[in-house]
């Protein structure tokens, strides 16, 4: 039988390497069958002693491992010790087996490591010498003997065994799944950590110290490949131990589980490790680990692979936390030593061109700065901290130079990768230091730090260098890009700054460098005066040069970036509504106002004036002379983006947002006469842009966005309408046809202005706003032959424009401009209602024109989002039936349109779901029309559910989340009988599928649906005197099974989903205890008989003792423990 087993396995292994797919598949299935052989240990060890086929050895070792995992509890003591002893012998003899490859050798250590862990908690005693020992003691004694043997071969074996044990006992992502409880894994980790991790680490540390001494004495050892291999293996084990997630002895199982959530964590050894990490007086005040890592690195930094591991170790040492450095004196000593070594490392790396090295050092710097921040280093001597700041600054500047070198040599991908992986991290390092330093200043803790003043001053000097060099480097990089483009493109479209530039480039630049720009702006604000002056001078220089060298693409590109830098410096670019002045800028301008003469212009005002010179001195004169081809659309967009952001922060600045506004800023941007001049100028600017940039949609969008930014400030609207040119803009006098989307944005802004008028005149101005619109709508829709002429190009163009204008008007909520419901005139509601039916009737006519259909849907979406707040019952009765008409029209038209693109169909359905989401979330606080709303949702969900389920649209997470939110609302409605929903069975199926979705929010939404359903059932039971509808009873039992299966058979995010899953299971068990018991029995009967009693005992801990919050919290706690004890036992097949 043994010979036949060897022959068969070898034959199947050879078959795996066949060129014929059917032979490979047959061989794979045959090996899988062999792998299920009960207790194959003697067969496998016989194969390992006789076969010369490396792949056969690989699968033999794998079979030993998997069988031992599966059968360990049933094996007798002699078999267990035989397996481990024979594996040790096999590993010792591997060097004589020249045919073994790297993977097979690695599998031998993996097999031994996994079996050692599986046997770790065994209690059997074995006769060893004169005493008795447990199996784990026997194993570890053997490992210690190997590492102390002095034999290079045995030392290497011990290191590799230790490496395998670290992987398995740390439960890393590479660890084998041995199908035991979390409690078992936790006990293994803590006992291994407490008994062996530190002794092993000390021996590895001692071994590495010996290697270091050998290298110093005999440098030629670095050319010995055998020596380098064992050195690499030892350093790898060393770094793996530094990655260990330490647990205190009394830690709960839940603490063990949650320690693996998230990414890589900081090094946090227990207090017992203090002598290894902190400086000792006997060792000359030097930490053994720190001195070894940095000292060994200096010797091997030219060797392959090993330096990378040591730099990772440095990163871990630069993030050391926990009880061993809790004492401030010890912490300061440790940080001083680490920083001393790190300074030498950074200084030496300033001139490096090694990408991997720079990435690692960037991470080391970031780890140190982000962990200890400025408060950590401010306690250290200046002679250590100041060089660190200066060397790190030089490293950043060197990185900028390296990026330029790569860009010049055509290695743009390498430059971009470096920016993403290294440079952003370096900038965030300084952001961490600055934010912490500012916090110390704000909390008045500076006096407690002896060296804060000097170090903070150096930090300011360093960040000033970084900001200035970053600005210059970004301009140089853009120039390099332009020059390369000029070599490839025709003269008419040489730069993206010219007419031939790509669309949306300003957004592309801001998104691509978003993280960088925010970090750089934060750094620049530490020296606001210098940063403002730098940008002002650069912008003035470029504009002066532009006036001399009109249309110069490099100047356009430079100005584009300078405007972006200016915007990020003086306001937060993500602002979409009126916002505060950034604190650093506000404080600086306020203080400067007190220190400088009244005649001296504020730095922010100076910078803004420089930016506005582009409009006034360059762009506007050329536009007035019809020379659009000499202006960069990109720079025009960027200048408008800057002006929009500036207006939200500085124009009529709010004392609500800002504590101390500079009087000079108030005088320039917050008093009547300047405001009238500013608003009049920009109204003229908007008119000029609308007139002259009619061929560039992006500039027109940026122009209309500027007007919207102005109108977001209700107080500023009063100044807009006082402009002599307001009526020209309001009635678009002298403006030729604009793109439809621009009309939408303009009418949105006009509506805000109209609603800012007093109630007495609001209706009059609203009528003026919509007069032309109404005439055109009536003129088009009122024609008897509209159906006949509807497909004419001119008619369709008019329809686009009218729908965009309506969307703009409907997007402004009248309720924001009134204090009370009684003051609402419902001007927009009445306008919408007048044309809603006609617009719905247009959908079949324009079914082939998806843009028009989507515009109509967007109109209804905007209406339901912005116009429902004060809706009374009478108006609701006339409006909500229109929603059902709309849905029926879209669903009927779309369903039979076979040529409709799936993307177009998705967008239509998405808009319908959005409309329903708006309806259920607008918040009917006055309870004006709850019945009408729930009835609308009832009818609408029957229309959209087939649209979703028949087209797999629930694969789209956002769409699915909103759909289940709507379903929860419907399930919770008092006047709706869930079982009467025609598509209810489809909804149930979708909920069950949603529970297994990869998106956390979808899973939560599905649990909430089930929760709402159980509440609905409880309400119906109360109304019916305790009677349970059979429909609901069967559905609840079905969902009980689904929730139990989710908890036990699915891997899920405990932090995010356990609470809502517990709440759902609690309500299901309370509503249907018999159904819960039936599902538990069904699950248990599917399990192996050997574990059934254990599972039953655990299920008995899940009981409900009450329905209050305390009882639910206790239930969730019991559920946590239940999952810890049961989940790993359950058969998932």
From Swiss-Prot:
<dbReference type="InterPro" id="IPR016024">
    <property type="entry name" value="ARM-type_fold"/>
</dbReference>
<dbReference type="GO" id="GO:0005049">
    <property type="term" value="F:nuclear export signal receptor activity"/>
</dbReference>
<comment type="function">
    <text>Mediates the nuclear export of proteins (cargos). In the nucleus binds cooperatively to its cargo and to the GTPase Ran in its active GTP-bound form. Docking of this trimeric complex to the nuclear pore complex (NPC) is mediated through binding to nucleoporins. Upon transit of a nuclear export complex into the cytoplasm, disassembling of the complex and hydrolysis of Ran-GTP to Ran-GDP cause release of the cargo from the export receptor. Xpo4 then return to the nuclear compartment and mediate another round of transport.</text>
</comment>
<protein>
    <recommendedName>
        <fullName>Exportin-4</fullName>
    </recommendedName>
</protein>
<comment type="similarity">
    <text>Belongs to the exportin family.</text>
</comment>
<keyword id="KW-0539">Nucleus</keyword>
<comment type="subunit">
    <text>Interacts with Ran and cargo proteins in a GTP-dependent manner.</text>
</comment>
<dbReference type="InterPro" id="IPR044189">
    <property type="entry name" value="XPO4/7-like"/>
</dbReference>
<keyword id="KW-0653">Protein transport</keyword>
<dbReference type="GO" id="GO:0006611">
    <property type="term" value="P:protein export from nucleus"/>
</dbReference>
<dbReference type="InterPro" id="IPR011989">
    <property type="entry name" value="ARM-like"/>
</dbReference>
<keyword id="KW-0963">Cytoplasm</keyword>
<keyword id="KW-0813">Transport</keyword>
<dbReference type="GO" id="GO:0005643">
    <property type="term" value="C:nuclear pore"/>
</dbReference>
<dbReference type="GO" id="GO:0005737">
    <property type="term" value="C:cytoplasm"/>
</dbReference>
